[in-house]
Amino acid sequence: MQLDPAEIDYFTDAVVAADPVPYFDYMLAHHPVWREPKYGVVIVTGYHEALEVYRHPEVYSSINRTGGPVLDLPVELAGDDLTDILEQYRAYFPSNDQLVTFDPPMHTDHRALLMGLITPKRLKENEEFLKRTADRFLDELLPKGQCEFIWEYAKRYAILAVADLLGVPEEDHPMLLALLAAERGPMLGNLQLQVSHHNSLERLYDYFIDKIERRRKNPAGDILTGMSLATFPDGTLPDPVHVARIAANLFAAGNETTLQLLGISLARIADDQAVQDQLRQDTALVPRFIEETLRIEAPIRGSFRLTKVRASIGELDLAPGTVVLLLHGAAGRDARVFAHPGEFDVQRANARHHLAFGRGIHTCPGAPLARAEAVYSIRRLLERTERIEISAEHHGPAGQRRWDLMPSYKFRGHNHLYLTCTERAAGLWRARAGRAVTRFLPRQRSRRRSRTWPAAACSTSSPKAAAWSGRSATSAAGR
């Protein structure tokens, strides 16, 4: 395909946002590093070139990570080293109080706090909640034979997974769901280039600050107490708001990466029966499927950086103050790294080399949780159903799908995803899942309990989807 990248505004073009593959492939073949002419942003699609940026946080600041192609600062960025001036004007950058926009040494101290909350031991303890919650939600959805997957399952699941990880009492879960459901301000990466200076995560700060202060006065020996008493690497006790921001950052990751990963994964499974059959025959392939999905459809397409000093990427020289956009979604299609990159291959040996979770000091700390959520959700869906399909009523027939995608140059995901399903008889899926030694039901009874609902049975907007009207504010965890 021939195109003129100088004629395409990657940040506002709705066609490219809906289907960026032709743009990605052309840029990889001709311009793996490209300075686009309208804003002067250096767009990096090449895998190795993106890795080079990730490896040098002393050169490339993350302060503009959740911003846009244009910097809105009251001062001109001039000089050979912008490190001090960027921190001086940090308040002018979106999500400036979030970990993803921090540079060392501030990033080092705060990330240490975060990693203390998501230890391997705590993730292991979280597994039972993930399994139990997946079944609880599927108990609600599968008997209907249809659902709007994003709002009725994925969003609730992603939020509650983080809530349990942080030790939020279950009686507070409905409050958190309601708190994170309301849209405030424009979406990050919107095609109108509107910048939101409202941080949706601030709604969580008061909640966690109150919990932290209470636990410091009266330790309870629970997870929240451990979080409240966590210290920086030098042994100092952080201000409660710093800990609250760290906790909120995990919710941001759930609201973005995990939510969209679940939607993208289910869309592919439901739309590609060959892949669905392959996974049903061997659910041990589900983790590989997830990595291949992340490679070819990164939920967070790109991440901004800002040069603090003079630098070069490939053969392109960059002055201090240059905005750089790393496109993870394109890097996953780099033929220098991934053979036949346009093919979806569940058995791909190096799929996990993708950059969907970033690299270096800003590697997504919630990646293990995101992977676990996707694995448990997909396995339980496959075990508890005989067939999952895209609702043709809502999304059109196969080959002519009308997806309801996020209108964003930064995110890849579904606003809504309507599915129909055939539920497996309870005794059959429990036996298949290995959760109990259960005899298979007689064939006639099994047929009676296995129900399929046509797409026509789907309402245009399910009651729960309507109750969740207004998309949640996209938060600050742009990978």
Predicted segments with their positions:
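A short beta-loop-beta micro-motif enriched in histidine and acidic residues
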Residues: 38, 455, 475
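Aromatic-glycine hotspot motif
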Residues: 211-214, 454-456, 460
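Short amphipathic alpha-helical elements of helix-turn-helix/winged-helix folds
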Residues: 268, 457-465
